[in-house]
């Protein structure tokens, strides 16, 4: 049967590096209540203040990593889409972005018009967060309601500890670890701490001591930090990397609120001060290289590390469109449970 579509969903990107396009993208992204989780009037005020200077700054950053074909994240996601067409045997493989184009609404509407009633929704985020996974699911629900679409959805669950994901990481990163290096830093995207507190169903575990490695399953199921730490530990164990030669940090802090620590910026300085000369950095929260990996780590992070006394920071590419990753992702999608 070929009546079951697969919809891959990633974050998105501005349409171009023009300031106006970047402003439009940032406005859509930051006004999402799952991203900035404060009441609408305050969120509108805060985002309006951010949009005074941030679009020009971000446009410059995007321009520094933009490819001839377009946004690296979009280009790489399209390549993964093509690779998945060789693996998914049940119907078409489509790609949507949560922000920007092609939108979830555009793609779901087209699939409905083509007669598809079964869709596997695949948010391309290994670890759970409301600002990534939940917002994708809720947007799909909104579209179905608004358009009165007759569709059933299976939803790919966070796969932070799944053997397929860990194996794909291992095979992708292994060649880089075969070269001499002093330390491996696993830099995950950060989140405000309040996002974690809100999602602790017990109200007893979040950020208390090192609860992430001992919390019960019901807590871990919605704890981004716990899932990041467990992803890192599973990867290091599979690779046989000794304790002390790898560590975890969190990047991309926005605003003044307390975010998950340790911050990647601080960790880069600490590692250089500890005598680390050759540093490898991988970003396991991202399945495709993007501004947060290429510019924030590969450019600015590398410069910061050298200024702090290090000699070389090597950014390990994300999974991107690696054929082995496509095979493993297909296995994950095949067993996505029916949810919507």
From Swiss-Prot:
Query: What GO cellular-component annotations does this UniProt entry give?
Result: cytoplasm
Q: List, in alphabetical order, the Gene Ontology terms for molecular function in this entry.
A: ferrochelatase activity; metal ion binding
Q: Entry's SUPFAM superfamilies?
A: Chelatase
Please give the chief subcellular localization of this protein.
cytoplasm
Taking the record's annotation, the residue ranges forming a coiled coil are none
Any GO BP annotation = heme biosynthetic process
User: EC class of this enzyme?
Assistant: lyase
Which positions are annotated as binding Fe cation?
189, 292
Write out the pathway annotation from the protein's UniProt entry: Porphyrin-containing compound metabolism; protoheme biosynthesis; protoheme from protoporphyrin-IX: step 1/1
InterPro entries, sorted = Ferrochelatase (IPR001015), Ferrochelatase_C (IPR033644), Ferrochelatase_N (IPR033659)
Q: Where in the cell is it found?
A: Cytoplasm
Which transformation does this protein catalyse, written as a reaction?
A: heme b + 2 H(+) = protoporphyrin IX + Fe(2+)
Pfam families from the UniProt entry: Ferrochelatase
Q: Which UniProt keywords apply?
A: Cytoplasm, Heme biosynthesis, Iron, Lyase, Metal-binding, Porphyrin biosynthesis
Which EC number(s) are documented for this chain? 4.98.1.1
According to its UniProt entry, the function of this protein is described as: Catalyzes the ferrous insertion into protoporphyrin IX.
Report the sequence similarity comment from the record: Belongs to the ferrochelatase family.
- Provide the protein name: Ferrochelatase
Q: Can you name the source organism?
A: Pseudomonas syringae pv. tomato (strain ATCC BAA-871 / DC3000)
Q: Which gene encodes it?
A: hemH
């Amino acid at each position: 049967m070929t009546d079951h579509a697969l919809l891959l969903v990633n974050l998105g990107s501005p349409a171009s590096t023009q300031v106006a396009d970047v402003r439009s993208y940032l406005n859509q992204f930051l006004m999402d209540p799952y991203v900035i989780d404060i009441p609408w009037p305050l969120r509108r005020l805060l985002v309006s203040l951010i949009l005074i200077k941030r679009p020009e700054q971000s446009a410059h950053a995007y321009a520094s990593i933009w490819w001839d074909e377009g946004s690296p994240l979009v280009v790489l996601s399209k390549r993964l889409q093509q690779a998945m067409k060789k693996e998914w045997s049940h119907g078409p493989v489509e790609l949507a972005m949560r922000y920007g184009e092609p939108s979830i609404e555009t793609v779901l509407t087209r699939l409905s018009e083509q007669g598809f009633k079964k869709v596997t929704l695949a948010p391309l985020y290994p670890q759970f967060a409301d600002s990534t996974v939940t917002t994708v699911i809720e947007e799909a629900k909104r579209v179905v309601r608004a358009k009165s679409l007759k569709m059933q959805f299976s939803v790919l669950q966070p796969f932070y500890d799944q053997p397929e994901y860990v194996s794909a990481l291992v095979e992708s990163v292994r060649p880089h670890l075969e070269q001499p290096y002093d330390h491996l830093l696993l830099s995950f995207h950060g989140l405000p701490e309040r996002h974690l507190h809100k999602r602790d169903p017990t109200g007893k575990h979040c950020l208390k001591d090192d609860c992430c490695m001992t919390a019960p399953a019901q807590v871990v199921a919605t704890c981004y930090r716990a899932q990041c730490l467990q992803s890192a530990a599973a990867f290091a164990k599979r690779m046989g990397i000794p304790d002390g030669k790898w560590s975890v940090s969190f990047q991309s802090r926005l605003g003044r609120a307390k975010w998950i620590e340790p911050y990647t910026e601080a960790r880069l300085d600490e590692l250089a001060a500890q005598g680390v000369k050759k540093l490898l950095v991988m970003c396991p929260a991202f399945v495709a290289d993007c501004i947060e990996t290429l510019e924030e780590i590969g450019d600015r992070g590398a410069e910061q590390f050298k200024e702090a006394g290090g000699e070389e920071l090597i950014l390990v590419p994300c999974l991107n469109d690696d054929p082995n990753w496509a095979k493993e992702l297909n296995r994950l999608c095949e067993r996505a449970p029916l949810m919507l």
